[in-house]
Regions:
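Conserved ATP-binding loop and adjacent catalytic segment of the adenylate-forming AMP-binding
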Residues: 198-199, 259-301, 309-313, 323-329
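Conserved AMP-binding/adenylate-forming
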Residues: 48-88, 174
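Conserved AMP-binding A3 loop
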Residues: 33-37, 130-156
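Gly/Ser/Thr-rich phosphate-binding loop
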Residues: 215-220, 228-283, 380
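Conserved pre-ATP/AMP-binding loop-to-beta segment of ANL
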Residues: 3-4, 18-21, 118-134, 140-141, ...
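Conserved C-terminal "lid"/linker of ANL adenylate-forming enzymes
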Residues: 384-386, 410-445
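Conserved ATP-binding/catalytic segment of the ANL
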Residues: 304-358, 362-363, 375, 386
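Conserved AMP-binding/adenylation subdomain of ANL enzymes
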Residues: 153-170, 177-237
Length: 445
């Protein structure tokens, strides 16, 4: 069923079966369920108290808790623009993002808020109903993408149309709500189908959340799924897993299917409010395009998307970047390479942009990373690439040994999440090949 707002979802199911659980979480060591009727009432109550803040953007340091979900829904219902930030991000990143989104107030853990030393700004360019997500990069090149509750609800509808859940299902929400895949596929997908959403207890409970909540459906990034499979943590009630936000090895998908669990692989972007295509058959890499979307493949192989109900309003306060993201006739340029088979299913084959995407959902902006490494390796001709999911440093004509290189880049390594650290070093005999404009021909690395 298609909804236009978060309140629409709650009001509909509170009217159809008010006592059915909307959310289940741990509270004081006990499992607590909140019905659709109870959640709706709580949202209305909190929204009333937030209306005094009209015209200000509320930055929510999302921790995935019940209170966090309530705050998001209530702030939007009160007419406040909202920016969702990852509560576990480094303090410096959070300060930059608070400033970038023109936050007028902030919600989150009191100690964290005090530590950040937040200072409210008086003006915001965001509108009521706008929800800002920062693209999942770890550099200051990450942009704030302006979505809306309507575009997010439409995205949830698209997912439910291809992979429907029922009121008897429980969807496990273990991903950050500050990531659009986690928000749509870990929360809205379940609620828009009238299912119950189990709110995970954080990374330290990855090892026992599935056994504790007993979900029937799960959305996961490849890194999380790999951990769950490796440690035999998939619960017996689980019947469907949606995997997205990064490349997923075929062996991992096959390991899940071998347990009798249906697995679907999804493709989407923050700029399209998450999902664009989902695999429905035996081939996880042949993805059916979502009902509201159209795809085409450009001459250079780039995937382009027409998603009028789900596409972003733009990048916050960055009209030039917004204009550059679209063709003259309105197609979104994804920076991904792919093809469409005879059945119209999407196959993603690689990336065109100078960005690496990792299995934990984060991204690395290559020109900036390479500039940092060049400062540690002056005079070296170098580039980064990704092979088998690992970061590889390629040097052209270098006279340094691998040990000398490892020592030189050690300061850069220690500031990176493990997924982004250099895993291998390769050498070419001569200089790296480049285009006429001086860019490395990454496809030749």
């Amino acid at each position: 069923m298609r909804f236009q707002s978060f309140l629409d979802i709650l009001e509909h199911y509170a009217g159809v079966f008010p006592e059915a659980p909307a959310l289940v979480c741990e509270d004081g060591g006990e499992k607590r369920a909140e019905s659709y009727a109870q959640l709706l009432a709580a949202v209305h109550d909190r929204a009333e108290s937030l209306k005094i803040c009209a015209g200000r953007c509320e930055a929510i340091l999302a921790d995935g808790s019940y209170d966090c979900v309530l705050e998001i829904f209530a702030a939007v219902a009160a007419g406040l623009p909202v920016a969702l930030l990852d509560a576990d991000a480094p303090d410096e990143t959070l300060r930059e993002q608070l400033n970038a989104c023109d936050a007028g107030l902030v919600w989150g853990d009191e100690d964290l808020c005090e530590e950040l030393g937040f200072s409210a700004t008086g003006t915001t360019a965001a509108q009521p109903g706008d929800i800002l997500f920062f693209t999942s990069g770890t550099t200051n090149r990450a942009k704030a993408v302006v979505l809306t509750e309507q575009s997010l609800c439409n995205s949830a509808y698209n997912g439910g149309a291809l992979l429907p859940l029922s009121p008897s299902d429980t969807l496990m929400c273990m991903l950050p709500l500050s990531h659009v895949f986690g928000f749509v596929c870990g929360l809205l997908w379940g609620l828009s189908c009238g299912a119950c959403v189990a709110l995970g207890r954080g990374a330290r409970h990855y090892i026992d959340d599935l056994a504790y909540f007993g979900p029937t459906a799960l959305s996961a990034v490849p890194l999380l799924l790999g951990f769950l499979v490796q440690h035999s943590l998939l619960n017996r009630e689980l019947k469907l897993i949606l995997v997205g936000a990064g490349d997923c090895p075929a062996a991992l998908l096959e390991a899940v299917k071998a347990k009798g669990i249906r697995v679907s692989f999804g493709y989407g972007l923050t700029e399209t409010s998450s999902g664009v295509a989902l695999s429905l058959g035996d081939d996880p890499y042949a993805m059916t395009v979502c009902p509201d979307d159209r795809l085409c493949i450009a001459e250079d192989g780039e995937i382009r998307i027409d998603a009028p109900t789900c596409v972003m309003k733009g990048y916050y306060r960055d009209p030039d970047a917004t204009a550059a993201a679209f063709t003259a006739d309105g197609w979104l340029c994804t920076g991904d390479l792919g093809s469409l088979d005879e059945a119209g299913r999407l196959h993603v084959t690689g990336r065109k942009k100078e960005i690496l995407v990792f299995s934990d959902g984060t991204k690395l902006f290559l020109p900036e990373a390479e500039a940092q490494l060049a400062g540690l390796l002056p005079g070296e001709d170098l580039a980064l690439c990704q092979k088998d999911g690992k970061v590889v440093l390629v040097l052209g004509g270098s006279q340094k040994t691998d040990e000398e290189i490892k020592t030189a880049v050690a300061p850069w390594q220690k500031d990176r999440p493990r997924s982004q650290q250099i895993a291998a070093i390769e050498h070419t005999e001569g200089a790296l090949t480049r285009t006429a404009t001086g860019k490395v021909k990454r496809w030749e690395l």
